Amino acid sequence: MRRRKAPVREIMADPIYNSKVITKFVNAIMLDGKKSVAEKILYGAIANLDARGEEKGFDLFERAIENVKPLLEVRSRRVGGATYQVPVEVRAVRRQTLALRWLIDASRKRNERTMVERLANELFEAANERGASFKKKEDVHRMAEANKAFAHYRW
Protein backbone atom coordinates (compact mmCIF):
# COMPACT_ATOMS: atom_id res chain seq x y z
CA MET A 1 0.00 0.00 0.00
CA ARG A 2 1.15 3.53 -0.68
CA ARG A 3 2.24 5.70 2.21
CA ARG A 4 -0.09 8.54 1.40
CA LYS A 5 -2.92 9.16 -0.96
CA ALA A 6 -1.91 10.24 -4.46
CA PRO A 7 -3.02 13.80 -5.21
CA VAL A 8 -6.06 14.08 -7.49
CA ARG A 9 -4.94 15.62 -10.77
CA GLU A 10 -7.08 18.45 -12.09
CA ILE A 11 -8.54 17.74 -15.53
CA MET A 12 -9.41 20.37 -18.09
CA ALA A 13 -13.02 20.84 -19.20
CA ASP A 14 -13.49 20.10 -22.90
CA PRO A 15 -13.53 23.11 -25.25
CA ILE A 16 -16.92 22.45 -26.92
CA TYR A 17 -19.30 21.64 -24.05
CA ASN A 18 -17.10 23.00 -21.23
CA SER A 19 -17.62 19.76 -19.30
CA LYS A 20 -15.14 17.69 -17.30
CA VAL A 21 -17.33 14.59 -17.72
CA ILE A 22 -16.85 14.81 -21.50
CA THR A 23 -13.07 14.96 -21.01
CA LYS A 24 -13.17 11.93 -18.72
CA PHE A 25 -15.34 10.06 -21.23
CA VAL A 26 -12.95 10.87 -24.09
CA ASN A 27 -10.01 9.64 -22.00
CA ALA A 28 -11.89 6.44 -21.19
CA ILE A 29 -12.77 5.74 -24.85
CA MET A 30 -9.23 6.47 -26.02
CA LEU A 31 -7.14 3.52 -27.19
CA ASP A 32 -3.37 3.66 -27.84
CA GLY A 33 -3.23 7.38 -27.00
CA LYS A 34 -5.39 8.34 -30.00
CA LYS A 35 -7.29 11.18 -28.38
CA SER A 36 -8.47 12.83 -31.60
CA VAL A 37 -10.12 9.55 -32.67
CA ALA A 38 -11.81 9.25 -29.26
CA GLU A 39 -13.05 12.86 -29.47
CA LYS A 40 -14.42 12.23 -32.97
CA ILE A 41 -16.32 9.19 -31.67
CA LEU A 42 -17.88 10.99 -28.70
CA TYR A 43 -18.72 14.25 -30.49
CA GLY A 44 -20.12 12.20 -33.39
CA ALA A 45 -22.32 10.24 -30.99
CA ILE A 46 -23.61 13.44 -29.34
CA ALA A 47 -24.30 14.95 -32.80
CA ASN A 48 -26.14 11.73 -33.69
CA LEU A 49 -28.29 12.16 -30.55
CA ASP A 50 -28.91 15.81 -31.50
CA ALA A 51 -30.15 14.69 -34.92
CA ARG A 52 -32.85 12.53 -33.32
CA GLY A 53 -34.55 15.78 -32.43
CA GLU A 54 -36.46 15.12 -29.20
CA GLU A 55 -33.84 16.46 -26.80
CA LYS A 56 -30.37 18.01 -26.91
CA GLY A 57 -27.61 15.43 -27.35
CA PHE A 58 -25.62 16.71 -24.38
CA ASP A 59 -28.68 16.52 -22.09
CA LEU A 60 -29.28 12.91 -23.18
CA PHE A 61 -25.58 12.18 -22.54
CA GLU A 62 -25.79 13.58 -19.00
CA ARG A 63 -29.05 11.74 -18.27
CA ALA A 64 -27.56 8.47 -19.55
CA ILE A 65 -24.61 8.78 -17.18
CA GLU A 66 -26.90 9.67 -14.28
CA ASN A 67 -29.10 6.63 -14.98
CA VAL A 68 -26.13 4.23 -15.08
CA LYS A 69 -24.39 5.43 -11.89
CA PRO A 70 -24.61 2.70 -9.22
CA LEU A 71 -25.46 3.61 -5.61
CA LEU A 72 -24.38 0.28 -4.09
CA GLU A 73 -21.97 -2.49 -5.04
CA VAL A 74 -20.74 -5.69 -3.40
CA ARG A 75 -17.16 -6.17 -2.20
CA SER A 76 -15.67 -9.48 -1.10
CA ARG A 77 -14.80 -9.78 2.59
CA ARG A 78 -13.18 -12.84 4.14
CA VAL A 79 -14.41 -13.70 7.63
CA GLY A 80 -13.29 -16.90 9.33
CA GLY A 81 -12.63 -18.92 6.20
CA ALA A 82 -15.80 -17.84 4.39
CA THR A 83 -15.96 -15.12 1.75
CA TYR A 84 -18.99 -12.85 1.93
CA GLN A 85 -20.24 -10.44 -0.70
CA VAL A 86 -20.75 -7.34 1.42
CA PRO A 87 -22.88 -4.49 0.01
CA VAL A 88 -21.20 -1.07 0.33
CA GLU A 89 -22.08 2.42 -0.87
CA VAL A 90 -20.17 3.65 -3.91
CA ARG A 91 -18.26 6.93 -3.52
CA ALA A 92 -19.11 9.71 -6.01
CA VAL A 93 -15.87 9.52 -8.04
CA ARG A 94 -16.08 5.73 -8.42
CA ARG A 95 -19.80 6.02 -9.23
CA GLN A 96 -19.00 8.20 -12.23
CA THR A 97 -16.01 6.08 -13.30
CA LEU A 98 -18.10 2.89 -13.24
CA ALA A 99 -20.91 4.55 -15.21
CA LEU A 100 -18.49 5.68 -17.94
CA ARG A 101 -16.78 2.27 -18.05
CA TRP A 102 -20.09 0.38 -18.29
CA LEU A 103 -21.39 2.65 -21.05
CA ILE A 104 -18.21 2.17 -23.09
CA ASP A 105 -18.08 -1.61 -22.53
CA ALA A 106 -21.74 -1.99 -23.49
CA SER A 107 -21.18 0.18 -26.59
CA ARG A 108 -18.21 -1.92 -27.72
CA LYS A 109 -20.26 -5.11 -27.41
CA ARG A 110 -23.12 -3.80 -29.58
CA ASN A 111 -23.31 -4.80 -33.23
CA GLU A 112 -23.98 -1.60 -35.16
CA ARG A 113 -21.44 -0.74 -37.85
CA THR A 114 -19.46 2.14 -36.36
CA MET A 115 -18.48 3.00 -32.80
CA VAL A 116 -20.24 6.36 -33.21
CA GLU A 117 -23.56 4.58 -33.88
CA ARG A 118 -22.99 2.05 -31.10
CA LEU A 119 -22.19 4.73 -28.53
CA ALA A 120 -25.08 6.97 -29.63
CA ASN A 121 -27.57 4.09 -29.38
CA GLU A 122 -26.24 2.92 -26.00
CA LEU A 123 -26.41 6.49 -24.62
CA PHE A 124 -29.95 6.88 -25.98
CA GLU A 125 -31.07 3.60 -24.40
CA ALA A 126 -29.35 4.38 -21.08
CA ALA A 127 -31.03 7.80 -21.01
CA ASN A 128 -34.36 5.98 -21.36
CA GLU A 129 -33.49 3.39 -18.69
CA ARG A 130 -32.88 0.53 -21.12
CA GLY A 131 -29.79 -1.06 -22.67
CA ALA A 132 -26.91 -3.22 -21.48
CA SER A 133 -25.21 -0.57 -19.31
CA PHE A 134 -28.44 0.16 -17.41
CA LYS A 135 -28.99 -3.59 -16.99
CA LYS A 136 -25.46 -3.86 -15.52
CA LYS A 137 -26.35 -1.24 -12.89
CA GLU A 138 -29.60 -3.07 -12.08
CA ASP A 139 -27.68 -6.37 -11.71
CA VAL A 140 -25.16 -4.77 -9.34
CA HIS A 141 -28.01 -3.31 -7.25
CA ARG A 142 -29.78 -6.69 -7.24
CA MET A 143 -26.58 -8.37 -5.95
CA ALA A 144 -26.30 -5.77 -3.18
CA GLU A 145 -29.95 -6.26 -2.26
CA ALA A 146 -29.57 -10.06 -2.19
CA ASN A 147 -26.58 -9.79 0.16
CA LYS A 148 -28.11 -7.20 2.48
CA ALA A 149 -27.84 -9.72 5.34
CA PHE A 150 -24.04 -9.30 5.31
CA ALA A 151 -24.14 -5.49 5.50
CA HIS A 152 -22.92 -5.60 9.12
CA TYR A 153 -19.50 -6.78 7.81
CA ARG A 154 -18.93 -3.36 6.21
CA TRP A 155 -15.57 -1.73 6.84
Swiss-Prot record:
SUPFAM superfamilies assigned: Ribosomal protein S7 (SSF47973)
CDD domains: uS7_Bacteria
Pfam families noted in UniProt: Ribosomal_S7
Keywords: Ribonucleoprotein, Ribosomal protein, RNA-binding, rRNA-binding, tRNA-binding
Listed InterPro entries: Ribosomal_uS7, Ribosomal_uS7_bac/org-type, Ribosomal_uS7_CS, Ribosomal_uS7_dom, Ribosomal_uS7_dom_sf
Keyword Nucleotidyltransferase recorded: no
An MF annotation (GO) of this entry: tRNA binding
Family the UniProt entry places it in: Belongs to the universal ribosomal protein uS7 family.
Function: One of the primary rRNA binding proteins, it binds directly to 16S rRNA where it nucleates assembly of the head domain of the 30S subunit. Is located at the subunit interface close to the decoding center, probably blocks exit of the E-site tRNA.
Assembly information from the UniProt record: Part of the 30S ribosomal subunit. Contacts proteins S9 and S11.
Protein name: Small ribosomal subunit protein uS7
